[in-house]
């Protein structure tokens, strides 16, 4: 009888001893910050008892901390890695019952000589749920590509991003305005048309991040995905660098100036340990000469200036204030000059951009982080003809003076706040995040248009009169633009979100979020749920699978809503004998916002990551995006001409299979290869406007940037040592893809067949450069020389698509082989 009470007491003692033992087990708290005492989230921390032991692993949260628990007191090796930073190794870490370790990670700087630092290698990140691609600032500097002064050209070498013939990027087949472009966390997308117009010096970028699926609920207003531009800031060391400060020359129609495109960066402390600055200035002057044009009409002058100024101050150990101001100015004397568009038919184009933002980050004593910020963007574009001569278009060329004068202004005021809560424990670890975003957008425009005469094959423009006064008329079509007026549009956008990162185990992570959007145009409450997960299949962390599905909505595009105020078009059509066919056709546009609903996209994807032998990292992804109720202009009866009404009848479809292989070597050497098979199509692909002369009904087809098969590769590799020169670096980039589609029209600009029925030839370009880094005069330098399109393949960017022209399918605008050089002054060590 006494055995049972004794057994009961023993069990109670054992039960009480378990939590006591757990509490006595050692804990290690690791805090990661950068050179400016800013918390570094998503850094991987490895704790290893011996080289043979399997390392323990944790990832820092928003506060830059992570904790190891249930670890015996001993001597360990601690390793910290994060993309964009140098990895850090602490060979001996000793701790007892509790220990705190503060670690400072340094951002990757341009390598000037062999130093005892190693770039963080690519790893399979168990906490990265989104489908994300990233290139670092050093990648942008090292990758050779045409016009390296423009970071937008480097975007073409990010898997999933395609650059169209106008230089605009498209994320996973989406339109440019369907991407959310952030500069250091603030929205800099052009408020009216959504184009990527802001220019930042390539030397100012720390990284460019692209997320196209499984996005956090924090990011909305863009069905295509997120394009994040992250710039640098100074530290406690003064740094100065400059690139291309020596003009280049060209031997084209004689020996002439080619261009001057210097870039300067200066950074350092205002008060060491407390306040820092960063300034990146760049400019260019291009003397563009066209060999195929006659002397005296073959020259275009383009100039541009830009400057990014930033400042950061740590008000206290818990308060960080940052601010920046970006200015851009661009001027082109003969915008669009080409063989088909002579000087007198080109406009003078001037563009400007002013972007500023401020953000404060405050850590509360309870572990919460609050971010509040304000941003302002202002874009302006002016296009002016060179005179008042009548403008005409023939099957082979244009003439007269450009018909269009425009003056547009677009603005956005943005206020945002994000609240991060400390991790909570419930069946795993939860990291909750909440936020709001309020934007006010404005757009105003002034347009003036002159008539356009469309000439028949073999006809010349009449020296006097117009297409309507000549009998027989030399024209196939004549367009005039009555009813032009000034345009003003505005909108207010309100957004809020809630996000939970649920770490169920060290290998299983689920992200669930809900986003709310509302604006003054659609005036509907929009709820966008998101769900994604990632699972690491092995203890070594070498295999991972991720999947997710989510709803996204586009912001209301003001350029479409402003189209009714842009005026109307009156089209006269002529028979082959020069006589008028029927009464003129009136083309006008209308938009009833009360009948509109927000376009809705379903985005789903799955990715598989695997570390292969020889340290090759492979990623395979499948992505599907389906958009319904997308804005499009169409006539009510689906016939050419008439009143075009803004409707929700467009459906977009995009699917893609992607395979990426990446291998990093010592220092910053590495190679990337990416293949994508995709299709980007719509049931109503045409974009009608008063300035679009295409005359047809809506029709299905591929988008103009659709490229079903695409292979890109780039890398930086050590080259052979050459006599008297020493070791060299070999940089390359390559792209091979299916040619873009184009429409076929007749001499009246009526669509022949379906949109995108024909394609440009297959595209291939290989850029190959050699670079030498050396020390001279007490400073570090880097000189690069090489060829863009070294194979000399003729890749056209324009085509005669008039089926009635003898030059139908004549391609032009070839980019031939080009020898380029670059010199960089890197300062002192």
State the predicted function of each range.
Residues 619-743:
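Gram-negative outer-membrane beta-barrel transporters
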Residues 20-136, 187-189:
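Periplasm-facing N-terminal accessory domains of Gram-negative outer-membrane beta-barrel systems
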Residues 532-645, 654, 761:
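Solvent-exposed loop/turn elements at secondary-structure boundaries
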Residues 86-88, 92-104, 113-233, 243-255, ...:
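Periplasmic N-terminal accessory/gating domains of Gram-negative outer-membrane beta-barrel systems
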Residues 615, 723-748, 771-829:
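C-terminal beta-signal and adjacent terminal beta-strands/loops
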Residues 119, 240-248, 279-283, 323-329, ...:
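Transmembrane beta-barrel strands of outer-membrane/channel proteins
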Residues 256-332, 348-372, 529:
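Transmembrane beta-barrel wall of Gram-negative outer-membrane proteins
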């Amino acid at each position: 009888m006494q055995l049972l009470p004794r057994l009961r007491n023993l069990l109670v003692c054992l039960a009480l001893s378990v939590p006591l033992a757990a509490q006595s087990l050692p804990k290690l708290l690791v805090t990661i910050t950068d050179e400016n005492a800013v918390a570094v989230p998503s850094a991987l921390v490895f704790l290893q008892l011996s080289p043979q032991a399997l390392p323990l692993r944790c990832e820092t949260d928003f506060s830059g901390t992570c904790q190891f628990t249930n670890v015996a007191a001993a001597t360990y090796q601690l390793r910290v890695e994060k993309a964009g930073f140098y990895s850090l190794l602490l060979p001996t870490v000793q701790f007892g019952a509790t220990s705190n370790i503060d670690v400072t990670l340094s951002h990757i700087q341009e390598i000037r000589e062999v130093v005892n630092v190693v770039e963080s290698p690519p790893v399979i990140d168990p906490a990265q749920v989104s489908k994300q691609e990233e290139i670092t600032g050093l990648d942008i500097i090292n990758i050779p590509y045409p016009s390296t002064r423009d970071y937008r050209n480097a975007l073409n070498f990010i898997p999933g991003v395609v650059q169209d013939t106008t230089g605009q990027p498209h994320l996973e087949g989406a339109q440019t305005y369907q991407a959310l472009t952030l500069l250091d966390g603030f929205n800099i997308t052009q408020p009216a048309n959504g184009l990527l117009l802001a220019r930042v010096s390539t030397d100012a970028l720390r990284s460019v991040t692209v997320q196209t699926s499984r996005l956090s609920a924090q990011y909305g207003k863009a069905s295509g995905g997120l394009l994040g531009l992250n710039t640098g800031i100074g530290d406690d060391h003064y740094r100065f660098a400059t690139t291309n400060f020596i003009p280049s020359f060209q031997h084209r129609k004689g020996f002439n100036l080619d261009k001057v495109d210097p870039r300067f960066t200066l950074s350092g402390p205002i008060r060491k340990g407390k306040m820092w600055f960063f300034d990146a200035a760049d400019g260019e002057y291009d003397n563009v000469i066209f060999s195929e044009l006659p002397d005296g009409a073959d020259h275009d002058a383009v100039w541009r200036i830009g400057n990014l100024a930033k400042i950061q101050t740590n008000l206290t150990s818990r308060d960080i204030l940052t601010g920046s101001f970006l200015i851009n100015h661009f001027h082109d004397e003969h915008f669009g000059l080409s063989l088909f568009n002579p000087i007198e038919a080109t406009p003078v184009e001037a563009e400007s951009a002013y972007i500023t933002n401020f953000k404060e980050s405050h850590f509360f004593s309870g572990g919460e982080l609050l971010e509040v910020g304000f941003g302002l963007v202002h874009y302006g574009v002016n296009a002016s003809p060179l005179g008042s001569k009548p403008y005409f278009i023939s099957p082979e060329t244009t003439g007269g003076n450009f018909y269009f004068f425009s003056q547009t202004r677009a603005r956005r005021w943005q206020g945002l706040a994000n609240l991060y809560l400390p991790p909570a424990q419930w069946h795993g670890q939860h990291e909750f995040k909440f936020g709001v975003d309020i934007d006010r957008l404005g757009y105003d425009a002034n347009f003036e248009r002159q008539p356009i005469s469309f000439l028949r094959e073999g006809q010349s423009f009449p020296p006097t009169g117009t297409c309507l006064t000549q009998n027989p008329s030399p024209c196939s079509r004549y367009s005039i633009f009555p009813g032009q007026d000034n345009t003003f549009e505005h909108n207010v956008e309100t957004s809020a979100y809630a996000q939970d990162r649920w770490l169920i185990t060290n290998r299983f992570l689920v992200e669930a979020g809900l986003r709310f959007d509302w604006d003054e145009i659609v005036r509907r409450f929009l709820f966008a749920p998101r769900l994604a997960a990632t699972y690491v299949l092995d203890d070594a962390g070498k295999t991972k699978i991720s999947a997710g599905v989510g709803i996204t909505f586009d912001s209301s595009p003001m350029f479409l809503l402003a189209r009714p105020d842009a005026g109307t078009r009156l089209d006269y059509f002529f028979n082959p004998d020069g006589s008028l066919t029927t009464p003129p056709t009136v083309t006008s546009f209308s938009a009833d916002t009360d009948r509109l609903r927000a376009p809705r996209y379903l985005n789903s994807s799955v990715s598989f990551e695997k570390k292969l032998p020889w340290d090759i990292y492979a990623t395979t992804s499948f992505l599907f995006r389906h958009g319904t109720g997308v804005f499009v202009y169409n006539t009510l009866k689906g016939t050419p001409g008439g009143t075009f009404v803004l409707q929700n009848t467009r459906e977009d479809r995009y699917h893609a299979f992607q395979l990426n292989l990446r291998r990093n070597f010592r220092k910053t050497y590495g190679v990337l290869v990416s293949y994508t098979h995709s299709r980007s199509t719509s049931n109503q692909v045409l974009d009608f406007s008063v300035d679009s002369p295409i005359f047809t009904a809506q029709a299905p087809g591929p988008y103009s940037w659709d490229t079903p098969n695409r292979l890109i590769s780039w890398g930086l590799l050590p080259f052979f040592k050459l006599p008297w020169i020493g070791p060299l670096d070999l940089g390359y980039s390559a792209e091979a893809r299916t040619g873009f589609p184009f429409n076929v029209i007749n001499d009246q600009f009526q669509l022949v067949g379906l949109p995108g029925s024909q394609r440009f030839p297959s595209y291939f370009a290989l850029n190959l450069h050699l670079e030498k880094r050396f020390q001279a005069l007490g400073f570090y330098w880097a000189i690069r020389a090489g060829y863009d399109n070294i194979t000399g393949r003729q890749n056209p960017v324009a085509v005669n698509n008039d089926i009635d022209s003898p030059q139908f399918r004549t391609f032009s605008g070839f980019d031939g082989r080009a020898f380029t050089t670059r010199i960089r002054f890197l300062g002192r060590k």
